[in-house]
């Protein structure tokens, strides 16, 4: 770990890269200099970033196989992106996580569709009841016996002794 963080070690790697690049530049027929330089830069960055990270992860992690697998998959995906590919390498764990996420989302969508369908059915039933109540039905004979102002009225024939009880009678008062 000390060697990886040492400034002299980093400078020696940079110096060796510079020497390699200068030897390539001296060849006048080299047309792919920029591509080679960018690949070497990426490789150096991966070297400096991945080795210390991998060592720390292996020391702190209980399952070293998963850490190594994850680091290798990440490096391969980075190289594929740099090469211009849109595809990515995935592990079985990632595929299972994505499948679980998709299944969970599908269940949520089905529950929402079920709730919306139930609400729509209730709304249709309510609209049907409202429509049925608004339809006017033709009536041939109107029954006036249930009208409020017709309940307690008696005709002259129905009064006792044929006399109207509501007519004022003569009252004589003694003085």
Swiss-Prot record:
It is found in: Host rough endoplasmic reticulum membrane; Host membrane, Host caveola; Secreted. It holds the Pfam family Rota_NSP4. SUPFAM superfamilies: Rotavirus nonstructural proteins. The N-glycosyl content is primarily Man(9)GlcNAc, with a small amount of Man(8)GlcNAc. Glycans are attached at residues 8, 18. Signal peptide: none annotated. The keyword Calcium applies. Belongs to the rotavirus NSP4 family. Binds 1 calcium ion per tetramer. This is Non-structural glycoprotein 4. The lineage of its organism: Viruses, Riboviria, Orthornavirae, Duplornaviricota, Resentoviricetes.
